[in-house]
Amino acid sequence: MDRKVLIIVENLPVPFDTRVWQEATTLAANGYTVSVICPKGKGYTEEYEFLQGVHIYRHDLPTEGNGAVGYAWEYWSALSNEYRLAKKCYKEVGFHCIHGCNPPDDIWMVARLFKSKGVDYIFDHHDICPELFEAKFGKATGLLYKSQLWLECQTYKHCKFAFVTNESYKKIAIERGGMKSEDVFVLRSGPKLERLKIQPAKPEIKRGRKYMVGYLGVIGQQEGIEYILKAADYIRNTLKRDDIFWGIVGGGPHLEALRKQCKEMRLDDIVEFTGRVPDQQMLDYLNTADVCVNSDEYNAMNDKSTMNKILEYMALGKPIVQFDLTEGKYSAQEASLYAKPNDAEDMAKKVIELLENPERGKQMGEYGRNRVVNELSWEHTSKALLEGYDRYFKNRGL
């Protein structure tokens, strides 16, 4: 009998969500029947598609909530669509389990409605929602914060086993979620090397500057892009250097606000916000960069989270500057310099240190590339995905 898995992701469409798409296509390539339910997004508007062996069901993206009532409506709208499409998928394709990808921590509710049909819930822990709430709103109190803790607890209570992105998340699954260690699989979001190809630099991107600093990622309120602007301002106006171009690649809800801030700081001639761009343009920018930065500030969320951008920089052989965060340091190790937490001036100094020592930067980049090739690429990390599902289905006699 076929092993059938339904993956539900609430906040991003596939194939755009790299981790979820890699999971889905890896399972499909290994003989599983895989379906995905996700929201629609820019460029991903078809309600049904069959891509690379994966059935994709999409629903309209709910309006982003604000406040208790707004969040409740947003989550209810998403859950209603997920349940509607799950019923459709169960009838058309079928599934033995629902693999829920947070945030938010509510997809177990959909799985509960199929429990009478023998469907189990598998949790894929992408973000620690209580810490995300604290980072976003600056407090770890109140009804909404307590609701995040309750939802996380219920998620682990109802899941058969879990995938987590790193050891910090595994510790949370055990200590806060009450999971057994053997039921928590560390599935790191390793990059696929065929997607991240090292290519010749394109000097014209630098706008006539000698050096370039690159950034790739979501442009949101929690990503700390303001630290990059402050670092660029410090280098230009305090160190009196005007030979560095900053290329910030990615889209997100904070993009226009940061473009406005950049212009107000009179940095728009040396800092470019590209917005969301095709993969080839992203590769052009990162391959041209001399140094790449990660501006995620120190907080409880970021300190425990693995950022995909770090591994992508490493895959392209780039030396990195980032703040001193636990999981960021585990990923990059000797491929990065570590600035004092939330200190834009120290970040700027670390950037200059690497730009003025290109041989050291080259060695760091080679170290990072080798670490990804030999340990952290999806080819290696995906073994945990297959191990977890193979054990699960064998226990079901499938």
Question: Model-flagged regions — what are they?
Answer:
Residues E223, Q280-D284, N294-A315, V321-S331:
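Nucleotide-sugar-dependent
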Residues S336-A344, E353-E359:
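Conserved acidic donor-binding segment of nucleotide-sugar-dependent glycosyltransferases
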Residues L239, V249, E256-L283:
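Nucleotide-activated donor-binding/catalytic signature segment of Leloir-type glycosyltransferases, i.e.
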Residues Y83-K87, D106-M109, L113-K117, C129, ...:
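Membrane-proximal helix-turn-helix segments that form the acceptor-binding/catalytic region
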Residues S168, S189-G190:
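Carbohydrate-associated surface elements
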Residues L6, F163, K206-A232, G247:
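Conserved donor-binding/catalytic core segment of Leloir-type glycosyltransferases
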Residues I174-E175, E182-D183, G190-K206, G224, ...:
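Acidic anion/phosphate-binding donor-loop and adjacent secondary structure
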Residues M1-Y44, Y48-I56:
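N-terminal subdomain of nucleotide-sugar transferases
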